[in-house]
From Swiss-Prot:
Autoacetylation at Lys-269 is required for proper function. One of its GO terms (cellular component) is nucleus. Interacts with MRG1 and MRG2. Component of the NuA4 histone acetyltransferase complex. A zinc finger (C2HC MYST-type) spans 202-227. Induction: Up-regulated upon UV-B exposure. The keyword Acyltransferase applies. Histone acetyltransferase which may be involved in transcriptional activation. Acetylates 'Lys-5' of histone H4 (H4K5ac). Essential for gametophyte development. Involved in DNA repair after UV-B exposure. Negative regulator of flowering controlling the H4K5ac levels in the FLC chromatin. PROSITE patterns: MYST_HAT. Acetyl-CoA binds at I312, L313, T314, Q319, R320, K321, G322, Y323, G324, K325, S349. Disruption phenotype: No visible phenotype, due to the redundancy with HAM2. Ham1 and ham2 double mutants are lethal. It comes from Arabidopsis thaliana (Mouse-ear cress). Its EC number is 2.3.1.48. This is Histone acetyltransferase of the MYST family 1.
Length: 445
């Protein structure tokens, strides 16, 4: 880095100066003075060469890899994704949009030149988009945090679509949003209408989800907005928690705005503009000011594959409170009331599978612990609304299934069940089914 090189030079320059003032060396060996002068000249030469080399790499090309100082004060490897000219600066004065290669893409950000260690620059690579966004070298705390805050969206993308998606969405267009009492840093690109291309921050009405460019616009809107909760029917109320069912066809603008908002925190997902086909279940914390959205899930009105959940999100300020687990559990309670088995939309990401595997493990093993006698996978499916294939894969992953005489047999030793239940973690908030007031969706003629 430039700063460390300057410090090192100052220290070396000071050395002959102190020798010159030392009576023991002042008039000593001429060779020693000559050597000191040579060190000084060499150091200055190296310093100039280093400075020229660092300046010679500017401006950095897209694809360049370099070390960058992050919020923790430490340097981490990054890849330059995009750059933009700082028109108030000099010829090589750019800001750079970087991806921290050790971390998830949601931490990508614009950084200034002084955050970069130019001595660590590696030549730009000729690559369009990485095949996968890496998430390497995570501590156990970071891994747990990502597991718990992971959000599952509409379709996962195949490899070709993934590359195209990453190229199109490589730079976050909105840096922050204001929603209710929170200012939230966004994670990913969201395809807002073109008139919002120049916005770094958006202001959302937390009740109708209309979004504006300026705070004053939001303040004027809030004086006129009559909503104090999401549109649609309140289908659940327990203490300060409420759930609202919103029909995408009846409340199209709200549903579309919800999708724009959600995409800021969802990666590698398809944003569905045809919201008519979906029902949205909005979870809220309620107080005397109204019902404040903390998260939601969506589901297709009619799914041939028996999907009971298409997209799920807990907003960042409300994560790690058990709301994600609550939303998953609620989707299965709806399936029970429909008299159907359900499963989340496929394919699941690795972390999405972790979330669901945890839910399935807790539900199934709790039943097996309490049940006396034999029980079949079909009976478990009927009791839980979990699809038989999900039950089988979960129990197989826990090594609780054996194949005997042409059929699968569940082997449930109590100590083994306790060990797996402990590993699955807490179940989060309970859904009090006695507080649900809901009837399955029927298309109106």
């Amino acid at each position: 880095m430039g700063s460390s090189a300057d410090t090192e030079t100052a220290m070396i320059i000071a050395t002959p100066a102190s020798n010159h003032n030392n009576p023991a060396t002042n008039g000593g060996d001429a060779n020693q003075n000559h050597t000191s002068g040579a060190i000084l000249a060499l150091t200055n030469s190296e310093s100039d060469a280093s400075k020229k080399r660092r300046m010679g790499v500017l401006p950095l090309e897209v694809g360049t890899r370099v070390m960058c100082q992050w919020r923790d004060g430490k340097y981490h490897p990054v890849k330059v994704i995009e750059r933009r000219k700082n028109y108030n600066g000099g010829h090589n004065d750019y800001e750079y949009y970087v991806h921290y290669t050790e971390f998830n893409r949601r931490l990508d950000e614009w950084i200034k030149l002084e955050q970069l260690d130019l001595d660590s620059v590696e030549c730009a690579l000729d690559e369009k988009v990485e095949d996968k966004v890496t998430s390497l070298k995570m501590t156990r705390h970071q891994k747990r945090k990502i597991d718990e805050t992971h959000v599952e969206g509409h379709e996962e993308l195949d490899a070709a679509s993934l590359r195209e998606h990453e190229e199109f969405t490589k730079v976050k267009n909105i840096a922050t949003i204001e929603l209710g009492k929170y200012e939230i840093e966004t994670w990913y690109f969201s395809p807002f209408p073109p008139e919002y291309n120049d916005c770094v921050k958006l202001f959302f009405c937390e009740f109708c989800l209309s979004f504006m460019k300026r705070k004053e616009q939001l303040q004027r809107h809030m004086r006129k907005c009559d909503l104090k909760h999401p549109p649609g029917d309140e289908i659940y109320r327990s203490s300060t928690l409420s759930m609202f069912e919103v029909d995408g066809k009846k409340n199209k603008v709200y549903a579309q705005n919800l999708c724009y908002l959600a995409k800021l925190f969802l990666d590698h997902k398809t944003l569905y503009y045809d919201v008519d086909l979906f029902l949205f279940y909005i979870l809220c914390e309620c107080d005397d000011r109204g019902c404040h959205m903390v998260g939601y899930f969506s589901k297709e009105k009619h799914s041939e594959e028996a999907y009971n959940l298409a997209c799920i999100l807990t907003l960042p300020p409300y994560q790690r409170k058990g709301y994600g687990k609550f939303l998953i559990a609620f989707s299965y309670e709806l399936s029970k009331k429909e008299g159907k088995v359900g499963t989340p939309e496929r394919p699941l990401s690795d972390l999405g599978l972790v979330s669901y595997r945890g839910y399935w493990t807790r539900i199934l093993l709790d039943i097996l612990k309490k049940h006396k006698g034999n029980i079949s996978i079909k009976e478990l499916s009927d009791m839980t609304a979990i699809k038989a294939e999900d039950i089988l894969s979960t129990l197989q992953s826990l090594e609780l299934i054996q194949y005997r005489k042409g059929q699968h047999v569940i082997c449930a030793d109590p100590k083994v069940l306790d060990r797996h239940l402990k590993a699955a973690g807490r179940g989060g908030l309970d859904v009090d089914v006695s507080k649900m007031i809901w009837t399955p969706y029927k298309e109106q003629s």
